[in-house]
Amino acid sequence: MDPAGFCCQTRLVIVAGKGGVGKTTVTAALARMAAGAGLSTLIVEVEGKSGLASTFDAGELTYQETVLHPGGAGAAEVRARTLTPDDALLEYLVDHGLRRISKRLVRSGALDVVATAAPGIRDILVLGKVKQLERAGVADHPGTVL
């Protein structure tokens, strides 16, 4: 199997499954394979509770991108970040000119109420942000979501 060819088949890979089935291990392996093939990789962690950073000997992930593996010698870098529905909603509001509303939601504690107002809204917020990252070219082959 040609790793570069495999990784170039899609711009986005979603790794999903029940707890304890190896999602973190598969994600790390895919990211390392893509980086080894020279493809810059962004891992987006959505559950916020995996040991992904430790597989790269890195600190805890945050909403801001962190370089997990710097690349070099023909390999590209592996970056990672967490993504929460609350952060995705706040960023969406700010990006659409609603910074004052986003600040009020945070101050009042109503952010969680808004982010969970309808069934499935948390998933929509996260997937919408992942789609935005992929379209912006930030999530290069493969942007992996746990």
Features from the language model and the residues they span:
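Flexible phosphate-sensing "switch/lid" loops adjacent to ATP/NTP-binding sites
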Residues: 1-14, 21, 26-146
